[in-house]
Design a protein with these regions (language model features):
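PLP-dependent amino-acid enzyme catalytic core
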Residues: 6-345
């Protein structure tokens, strides 16, 4: 087992990165999240919170799984995409939307655009899973493939936007996206108010930023941790150095976690996240198998990353949670972010 590598939030000792623009981490207020929830509620599922006695025993904690793998389009991404697209003015919506994504955000944007009756142009890396490409096409998205690098995705999306005149719906560097993603943690804390910590995967940072805001907006004492593959560790490096780091390429099995933090999400996380935990490829596979076998739900490797560090010996103790006199064991929420995986029989 590899040791947990937490990033403890000591902002006063961190160097300040050049974020650009006038964005402030407090720009997304609680009321913004509440309005986003009201906007998307009629169109999405309120996903269940499931438990597993077996996984509780393995982790030495009470685990509460927010099952976004059972969400429409198969991931949490529909929350942010729906909020962003239904926030557009009629004039902007008529132009259509463009985005880049390895799959789940792509499907979410295509789906939400279809609900609003507008066009969606989607840039995807050529190594994106076939199941995710088929989903985008089924929802009516128009796919342009690019090289599997962060730079190629951004450059290709900019070209498609210039050619089409469509509105960019960034996968994570967008207040509307982050506010939408925050509604998953909002629901989790409404259903299970007394949590000691919440763990969520981190890639571009939209979900983790939203989880920080959505959880801590209701419970100021809850800790929030990001979970990230060792082979895609830019969030860990960014938060330890205090300078935004880029992920040039990655070969992790967690294909949904191959993006880098953006200035906006970096700013939010630097102010709010309590740590980032790195996990190995073997640990990701093990967590995925445990969920499939014990909970009988389909989760993709990217979605299972948040369980992985808790299956290590002393994994929970590394979170440094305060003792709760009302509960014998720590109570930890886990965001299962998606379930879009291709089955080959």
């Amino acid at each position: 087992m590899l040791p947990v590598k937490p990033v403890w939030n000591k902002l006063e000792s961190m160097a300040r990165a050049n974020l650009g623009g006038d964005f402030k981490p407090g720009a997304i207020e609680w009321e913004t999240i509440v309005r986003a929830h009201e906007r998307i509620r009629p169109r999405i599922h309120r996903t269940p919170v499931l438990t597993s006695a077996t996984l509780d025993a393995l982790a030495g904690a009470e685990l509460f799984f927010k099952c976004e793998n059972l969400q429409k389009t198969g991931s949490f991404k529909i929350r942010g995409a729906t909020n962003a697209i239904f926030s557009l003015s009629e004039e902007d919506a008529a132009r259509g939307v463009v985005t880049h994504s390895s799959g789940n955000h792509a499907a979410a944007v295509a789906c939400a655009a279809g609900w609003r009756g507008i066009a969606a142009w989607i840039v995807m890396p050529k190594n994106a899973p076939a199941v995710k490409c088929r989903a985008v096409e089924a929802y009516g998205g128009k796919i342009t493939f690019c090289e599997p690098t962060v730079a190629s995705r951004a450059e290709t999306a900019a070209r498609v936007q210039q050619e089409t005149g469509a509105v960019m719906v960034h996968p994570y560097d967008d207040d509307r996206i982050i506010a939408g993603q925050a509604t998953a943690a909002k629901e989790l804390l409404e259903d299970v108010p007394e949590l000691d910590a919440v763990l969520a995967p981190v890639s571009g940072g939209g979900l983790l930023s939203g989880t920080c805001l959505g959880a801590k907006g209701q419970n100021g004492t809850v800790k929030v941790f990001g979970c990230e593959p060792e082979r895609a560790d830019d969030a860990y490096r960014s938060l330890t150095s205090g300078v935004l780091q880029k992920l040039e390429s990655s070969d992790t099995i967690a294909d949904g976690l191959r993006a880098s933090l953006a200035p906006r999400t970096f700013a939010i996380l630097r102010e709010n996240v309590d740590g980032v935990l790195l996990v190995s490829e073997e640990e990701i596979v093990e967590a995925t198998k445990r969920i499939w076998e014990r909970m009988k739900v389909v989760v993709e490797p990217s979605g299972a990353v948040a369980l992985a560090p808790l299956l290590r010996s002393s994994g929970v103790s590394k979170l440094r949670l305060r003792k709760n006199s009302e509960h014998a064991k720590p109570r930890i929420g886990i965001i299962l972010s998606g379930g879009n995986v291709e089955l080959k029989c």
